[in-house]
Amino acid sequence: MAIKTKRWDEPKEPDDGLRLLVCRYRPRALLKSKETWDLWWSQLGPSKELHAAIYGKNGPPMPWDEFRRRYVEDMSAQEESIAVLAEKVATGTTLTLMCSSACVDPARCHRTLLRQLIEERMARANHEIANRLSDH
């Protein structure tokens, strides 16, 4: 079970598994025939407001720590989507979370935060299972 992260314009590799675009916006002017992802879940991208803030569209760019806090907070409304992805990975599907070609630093990209949220969800599920087993 693996969760990888990439930009959407990085070459496809045989072990990418399910390639999931997690951007709020679809890449502009990209023909459908040139799409490099299997599914697009825009709800897992930053909100329009958060996207504008991190890129400084309405003033100075938002500091990373503030972006991280707000993105994680926003994703609490996407718990079901995160649980679905955690289940896919837990059952052996490799998942590649894909973001904008402009997002060159994975350490400062929401796709890495999302990977952490999925991994945390998997850990909680494993903990719940262990607790149930120890009760018997």
Residue spans of the language-model regions?
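Residues lining hydrophobic/aromatic ligand-binding pockets adjacent to catalytic sites
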Residues: 1-136
